[in-house]
């Protein structure tokens, strides 16, 4: 809840030019018609998007880096005098609007990788937002987790708001355990007092909430040695985020809701998911992954070339409407168009089909189109890409159109490239997945279990589920549960391993079977709640109500 410093003053122009030169750029990179640095000036005017996209892009990149470095100057002073302190500021996930629970990369990731701040910190006011499901809260943690990749001393600080009225004890427990599973190591209840003594508009005036928090904290004490010395286990699948995409506003319109719904749809298939950014492609981290989900329309040329090579070496790329079609200058992206085997003619975004927040908008949105695939039916919302197979793709005859729109244009394309494959959807499958999962009722933000804000969707489109799972079919899932919609997160530590389970339904799962993959300690296990759990080889049996932790100790 602070702003990064902005460049300005008489020295800004020269500093901008020196920064660009330090990156090996030429005047023509900043402005197509320029050959002299003296003609290049920092310009943060948003109107440059159309008139001078190169300068628009590099001015924004410089603005971001300037803010990060200026913040780092202050942080370094504090670190000199307070070497053991975590230094940070609370990140609200509610704004800007298009970045609700999809934080900007330079703030949520790069700031911490460059140690401009050293304590990632955000909050879970998800119970105020009619997004698709409260599970979206975990995007905040996963973004911050991408920021602390390789930073063992940086601990994620997170507000787990127990406020009542507004939140509920069961919702709070899901969010609390979810945050632990996604990397929270410092928990903060913010305002945890009754209304009579609260110093803000927030308070907790509900006995059951106090009881739930006390219970959960006692449970945390049974595996906090793992939480504090460990980190979430990396997966084999990743979702792409980038500063380039942020600069070009790729989350505007329905694309933010589409990315949030895609994220939860992937996690609901028991697929561990990490977030990758441009630096992960250029530094080789991408090579550790087998599947990459791409929703961003703009990807830098440097990152695109690495993604393309990764596909050719065996990676599986899954793209949604318009993904990867443009580079950092808003020009056609040669690398990613080639690897997908398609060109983009246009993107249709009808007003009556737009979705900002799923619970309040999707039930009332009108479908753009409908496709049939794999024996099922998918309604299309938000955006539809008009794609055309590229000439080399047609000549090679390798691409397969797996589904078409009623007018015959391609809706789903599979394109092999050497050892790898790309799947391209001409629509936003996450929104199709949630269609009919949310009732058409008023957006009630009360604490009632019947309120829409606390509603847990379960009736998802099965055809969309199969489609979203398609690129990950060959992955070995480290944890499999006998009931659907049970999220599992693995925490690994030298002191043991914990599996955090969150039940995203309201049904108590009696006799839940949890099948373990590889790399789990042998021997007895226990539950944080103290309830019974039985182990037979790689199978565990337990009862799961809302959330739980399975604990494997190394001592």
Per-range role (PLM):
Residues 72, 118, 123-555:
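Carbohydrate-binding surfaces of carbohydrate-active enzymes
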